[in-house]
Amino acid sequence: GKLNINKESIKGVSMELSGKKAVVFGGTSGIGLATTLLLAENGAEVTAISREPKKAGALSNGITTRACDVLDRGAVEAVLEELSPIDILVTAATGGKRAFGPFLEMDLDGYKASFDKLWGYANVVRYGAMHVSDGGSITLVSGAPARNCLPGQVALSSVGNAVEAMMRAVAREVAPRIRINAVSPGTIDTPMVIAKGTEREELYRQMTTNNLIPRAGMADEVAQGILFVIKNNFVTGTTVDVDGGWLLREP
């Protein structure tokens, strides 16, 4: 027989983005830029925030831009208050430096500086949550090393773990009014990698050769993962991996 679907019973399963107010920290480059453009394409009114004023003024297509450093707590608080109320809050801002190499040989000041990403996210979540509307969402970008740390990635792993732990703890505090999730990318082709041409291709080949999908991902693919956790109203307190099988790779 014909399947009868009660549309009222599934109403609200997915957030409609048309007319929703979205704020994307780190929204003018890499994964953040891809997210900004995808949200705008889906009808959201997007404000992209960057610590570099030149980048912040480079977008068009109805996308608003603001300059703000996520490590400047007062500036973060002010810009979020200005943009309130917010339906969708995303932070993909790196916030600081990245330290690589064996922990026992690592400059501990460099290791400490890596945690600026966490403090930037903490500022955005702490001051953003009070301006997110009922039924809204917050999404953080972590990273695959959080749960599969390869040699030399202790700083990335530590910071990623801290970001995801904060997300899970905050999810309990803000539920059911707000949902908060993390999206964890693997190796992604973004401007953060300085190498060019064949050197860049070889670097990505070496980094992904043991992945189940042996290539670097694209920022647009991560943005699709971010869009998923934003739109699905039954997802909170979780991490969605967009990593080409990084977590299942052989050492």
Label each region the model flagged.
Residues 94-110, 194:
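Conserved mid-core segment of classical short-chain dehydrogenase/reductases
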Residues 187-210, 249-251:
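A glycine/serine/threonine-rich, flexible loop-to-helix segment
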Residues 164, 173-189, 235-242:
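Conserved Rossmann-fold SDR core element
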Residues 28, 36:
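N-terminal Rossmann NAD(P)H-binding glycine-rich loop of SDR-like oxidoreductase domains
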Residues 60-74:
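Rossmann-fold cofactor-recognition segment
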Residues 102, 108-123, 130, 137-175, ...:
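Catalytic loop of short-chain dehydrogenase/reductase
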Residues 215-242, 247:
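C-terminal substrate-recognition "lid" of short-chain dehydrogenase/reductases
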Residues 25, 86-95, 140, 181-185:
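Rossmann-fold scaffold of SDR-type NAD(P)-dependent oxidoreductases
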